[in-house]
Swiss-Prot record:
Organism, as annotated: Panchlora viridis
InterPro entries: Pyrokinin_CS (IPR001484)
One Gene Ontology CC term in the entry: extracellular region
Family statement drawn from the similarity comment of this UniProt entry: Belongs to the pyrokinin family.
Protein name, entry field: Pyrokinin-5
Protein's cellular compartments: Secreted
GO molecular function, one term: neuropeptide hormone activity
Length: 17
């Protein structure tokens, strides 16, 4: 996963595109 994202999950899930 990436550190870029609006959601908190995006931190470990990756950028939500």
């Amino acid at each position: 996963g990436g550190e870029t994202g609006s959601d908190a999950k995006a931190m470990w899930f990756g950028p939500r595109l």
